C-alpha cells in the first residue's frame, strides 16, 4: 500500500485538492505522477488510517503489509498550516506517526514492512510501528553484502528484510540466498525463473533458515570477516542459549 500519495487524476484529489502538499500559483511538479498528502492535516490522517482499516475490514485474512512511499515532498506548501509553513516537515512526520500508532494499536499482530524509496525511513522511531524495513531497492547480492553489513552496525537482523531476486543473474541462487539469509529471508522472484534444482534448493534453504531463525533474529552477532578487508565476508549468529549457531 502507498496511502500517503495521491494521483492528480483521482476522485480523492478532485474532492480534496487542499489535502495535497502543493504550492499555490506555481507550476506543479509531479514525482512519478504523484503528490504527497498533507499529513499535518488531521482529516488527512483519518483518511490514511481509513485506507488500512477498510482493507482489513474487507480482507481480515491479510497477513502482511508493505507500506511504501516513493515520492519525496515536492511543491512545499501546506494549505492546512497556512502561515505556519515552517512547521510543515515536523507536523507532517508527527502526523504520519499518529496514523501508524493507530494502525499498530488496532492491528498489533499484522507484520508490517516499511519501505520508502528503498531505505529512506530506516530509523528507530519508525521501527516502533513496524516489524521490519526494506534496507534498499538495490537487491544485487554483491552490493547487498555491503548494504547489510553497514545496516547491521545499527539495526538487528530481525529488523532488516533481505530477499532473493532476479538481480545479478550471474550469481547463483545459492549465493543470493546466502546473502539474504543474513537478515529476514524472503523471495521476490518468479518461480518459473528457477530450475527444478534451484527450486528444491530454495525450499531446503527456507527450512534451514527457519531452523536457525531464533539465532539469526534474536541471537548475538559476531563479525568474522569484513567485506571491506578482502574479497569475502563472514558473520556468525549464536542463539542466546548457545544451542544454535
PLM region spans:
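Phosphate/diphosphate-binding loops
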Residues: 1-3, 44
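Active-site neighborhood of glycoside hydrolase catalytic domains
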Residues: 11-174, 178-200, 206
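Short, solvent-exposed beta-strand-terminating loops
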Residues: 6-9
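Conserved structural scaffold segments of CAZyme catalytic domains across common CAZy folds
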Residues: 201, 216, 242-243
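Carbohydrate-binding surface patches
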Residues: 228-245
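Short, Gly/Pro- and small/polar-rich lid/capping loops
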Residues: 104, 222-226, 236
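Glycine-rich, Lys/Arg-enriched anion-binding loops that position phosphate/diphosphate groups
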Residues: 205-231
